[in-house]
């Protein structure tokens, strides 16, 4: 007696990778995520490789994990993969105190983020329309 299978939360032509608790604010992580949304997976990896932002390497690692999941777990064609979604979410906020003048203290907030990257395989007819345009 096993539990019934839960339905997939993403489509059959998609694969995902999730990274929790990245030590960067969601606002800064979203700037990097905007660079790769709706781009070919190979172009997105190249963009992240040459990005000057510190968190770009962690995003690149997550993207490469999503590509590997698509290839190995779902048998999708790597050459036709597109970054369909790059979702950024808030995680915990670590609070520290910074000593100020007159014996006071100021709160310093260190934000953490979640990242979810979903890659999808483009269909043949969509690809030919994009090349024709």
UniProtKB/Swiss-Prot annotation:
<dbReference type="InterPro" id="IPR047867">
    <property type="entry name" value="Ribosomal_uL22_bac/org-type"/>
</dbReference>
<comment type="similarity">
    <text>Belongs to the universal ribosomal protein uL22 family.</text>
</comment>
<keyword id="KW-0687">Ribonucleoprotein</keyword>
<comment type="function">
    <text>The globular domain of the protein is located near the polypeptide exit tunnel on the outside of the subunit, while an extended beta-hairpin is found that lines the wall of the exit tunnel in the center of the 70S ribosome.</text>
</comment>
<comment type="function">
    <text>This protein binds specifically to 23S rRNA; its binding is stimulated by other ribosomal proteins, e.g. L4, L17, and L20. It is important during the early stages of 50S assembly. It makes multiple contacts with different domains of the 23S rRNA in the assembled 50S subunit and ribosome.</text>
</comment>
<keyword id="KW-0699">rRNA-binding</keyword>
<keyword id="KW-0694">RNA-binding</keyword>
<dbReference type="InterPro" id="IPR001063">
    <property type="entry name" value="Ribosomal_uL22"/>
</dbReference>
<dbReference type="GO" id="GO:0003735">
    <property type="term" value="F:structural constituent of ribosome"/>
</dbReference>
<dbReference type="Pfam" id="PF00237">
    <property type="entry name" value="Ribosomal_L22"/>
</dbReference>
<dbReference type="InterPro" id="IPR018260">
    <property type="entry name" value="Ribosomal_uL22_CS"/>
</dbReference>
<dbReference type="GO" id="GO:0006412">
    <property type="term" value="P:translation"/>
</dbReference>
<protein>
    <recommendedName>
        <fullName>Large ribosomal subunit protein uL22</fullName>
    </recommendedName>
</protein>
<keyword id="KW-0689">Ribosomal protein</keyword>
<dbReference type="GO" id="GO:0022625">
    <property type="term" value="C:cytosolic large ribosomal subunit"/>
</dbReference>
<dbReference type="InterPro" id="IPR005727">
    <property type="entry name" value="Ribosomal_uL22_bac/chlpt-type"/>
</dbReference>
<dbReference type="InterPro" id="IPR036394">
    <property type="entry name" value="Ribosomal_uL22_sf"/>
</dbReference>
<dbReference type="GO" id="GO:0019843">
    <property type="term" value="F:rRNA binding"/>
</dbReference>
<comment type="subunit">
    <text>Part of the 50S ribosomal subunit.</text>
</comment>
């Amino acid at each position: 007696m096993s539990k019934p299978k839960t339905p997939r939360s993403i489509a059959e032509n998609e694969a995902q990778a999730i990274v929790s608790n990245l030590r960067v604010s969601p606002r800064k992580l979203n700037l990097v995520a905007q660079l790769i949304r709706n781009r070919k997976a190979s172009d997105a990896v190249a963009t992240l490789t040459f990005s000057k932002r510190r968190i770009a390497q962690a995003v690149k690692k997550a993207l490469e994990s999503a590509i590997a999941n698509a290839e190995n777990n779902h048998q999708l064609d790597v050459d036709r993969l597109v970054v369909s979604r790059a979702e950024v979410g808030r995680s915990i906020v670590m609070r520290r105190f910074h000593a100020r003048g007159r014996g006071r203290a100021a709160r310093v907030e260190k934000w953490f983020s979640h990242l979810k990257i979903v890659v999808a395989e483009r269909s043949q007819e969509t690809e030919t329309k994009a090349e024709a345009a």
